[in-house]
Curated annotation (Swiss-Prot):
Family note: Belongs to the 'phage' integrase family.
Pfam families named among the record's database cross-references: Flp_C, Flp_N
Organism of derivation: Zygosaccharomyces rouxii
Transcription listed as a keyword: no
Signal peptide (from-to): none
Name used for this protein in its record: Recombinase Flp protein
The UniProt record lists the keyword Ligase: no
């Protein structure tokens, strides 16, 4: 069983590597590669030739549909590459290349290939499933199965409704899942990653893929009138192109800031995985690709919760659905639409699925009272006013009392290679918050480092702190300090 799993992972990694290399080759150079293979390579490398043929066909198809700016997706490429590779033949005596392709009428494709890959001839067969008794039985089977899936969907909705009914039910559910992760995982890296995935998807009402695709270079500290400060990061790749994810102080066990702090201590930066033929718009993503499947498998096997026992039910993506339902129960339907990246509005440059089901405009930031409500520090009135649940527990006052860490070497040791990529002011706030909330901050004293020129900052002065950190260490290593939206790289 383990051997099969390892083989599958190895195959996926090889396919991703092949696609990345192929994507670097320009379209006209792809044609030259095809001619070179047909002229010089014997025996014929079918996989290699099929890959080049697939890429130029998909590129040409997108261009003919006036979708020149739309990239070739890796999943689409693999689907058609497999079909061509299985049926590819080459007759060197007549210089004829033949294969099957998913088209009703391949005549235009044949003419196009013969024009650009001259003097070779092409025979393209129509790839169709056989129309036999089995296909008809399968159609009936699918119709009946669809009816059962509707029943399954109703069951999923019922379970989500139960979890999202009250504050106690939703955060109690999250707490029990956190206990499960703590008890049933042995590796600290896995424990930290699962906890971040769980807590951040619930607190952000977001798809697990959105969290995974977060660009860690874009983390920034932003002010909030109800919570003091929070972290925000940009997600370049979503169903609609753009969105933010947020990490903010929370009153209960579920605290995305603490989860993020732990995760960054146990993991190194994860290079961005290439999913289209275009260069990635950013270098590092927050979570590794395989984590979502790993989490799904863990939860389905280890948890006794009814929602996780439903075949093909949501697991890594559950937080998005539950939190949306929870906000709706508290008369925040519109807020859930914006925060969760849902709507029926249409935008330019997004897929038809996205246009039909999703909308998110980056200029529309979620209202502060939404974070206040989810944090557990506040109750929200009908007029959207925020009232402290406990007057003695004021997050803004707590934020003012957080002693800021002034030793950059402490931060480098705490976050490892992440400290070379994530803006330093973000790590200053994150580490200071985590120490303070974990009661380490009460005993943590900021001492002047005269030898390095780093003073104490009793007023938590943000600009003074970052300027001092920069001045003290600029000669020792190159560090990017991000303050607001200005970047100073020395």
């Amino acid at each position: 069983m383990q051997l099969t799993k390892d083989t599958e992972i190895s195959t996926i990694n090889r396919q991703m590597s092949d696609f990345s290399e192929l994507s670097q080759i320009l379209p006209l150079h792809q044609i030259s590669k095809i001619k070179d293979i047909l002229e010089n390579e014997n025996p014929l490398p079918k996989e290699k030739l099929a890959s080049h043929l697939t890429m130029i066909i998909l590129m040409a198809n997108l261009a003919s549909q006036k979708r020149k700016d739309v990239p070739v997706k890796r999943s689409t490429f693999l689907k058609y590459q497999r079909s061509i590779s299985k049926t590819l033949q080459y007759d060197s005596s007549t210089k004829t290349v033949s294969f099957e392709y998913h088209l009703k009428d391949p005549s235009k494709l044949i003419k196009g290939l013969e024009d650009v890959v001259s003097p070779y001839r092409f025979v393209v067969g129509v790839h169709e499933k056989p129309d036999d008794v089995m296909s008809h039985l399968s159609a009936v089977h699918m119709r009946k199965e669809a009816g059962r899936k509707r029943d399954l969907g109703n069951k999923i909705n019922d379970e989500i409704t139960k979890i999202a009914e009250t504050q106690e039910t939703i955060w109690g559910f999250v707490g029990k899942t956190m206990d499960l992760i703590e008890a049933r995982t042995t590796r600290p890296t896995t424990k930290a990653a699962y906890n971040l995935l769980l807590q951040a998807t619930f607190m952000n009402c977001c798809r697990a893929d959105d969290l995974k695709n977060t660009d860690i270079k874009t983390f920034e500290v932003i002010p909030d009138k109800h919570l003091g400060r929070m972290l925000r990061a940009f997600v370049p790749e979503t169903k609609t192109g753009t969105r933010f994810v947020y990490f903010f102080p929370c009153k209960g066990r579920c605290d995305p800031l603490l989860a993020l702090d732990s995760y960054l201590q146990w993991t190194d930066p994860i290079p961005k995985t290439r999913t289209t033929d275009e260069d990635a718009r950013y270098d590092y993503q927050l979570l590794r690709n395989s984590l979502l499947g790993s989490y799904d498998g863990f939860i389905s096997k280890q948890s006794d919760e009814s929602i996780f026992k439903i075949p093909n039910g949501p697991k890594a993506h559950l937080g998005r659905h539950v939190t949306a339902s929870y906000l709706s129960n508290n008369e925040m339907d519109k807020e859930a639409t914006l925060y969760g990246n849902w709507s029926a509005a249409r935008e330019e440059g997004v897929s038809r699925v996205a246009k039909a089901r999703y909308m998110h405009t980056i200029e529309k930031s979620p209202p502060s009272y939404l974070f206040a409500f989810l944090s557990g520090f506040y109750n929200i009135t009908a007029e959207r006013a925020c009232e402290l649940v406990d007057p003695n527990s004021n997050p803004c006052e707590q934020d003012k009392n957080i002693p800021m860490i002034s030793d950059i070497e402490t931060l480098m040791a705490r976050y490892g290679k992440n400290a070379e990529i994530i803006p330093m002011d973000v790590l200053v706030f994150l580490s200071s918050y985590a120490r303070f909330k974990n009661n380490e901050g009460k005993e943590y004293k900021l001492q002047a480092r005269s030898s390095r020129g780093v003073p104490d900052f009793p007023d938590n002065g943000r600009t003074a702190l970052y300027n001092a950190l920069t001045a003290a260490h600029v000669k020792r290593r190159k560090i990017s300090i991000v303050v607001g939206r200005s970047i100073d790289t020395s």
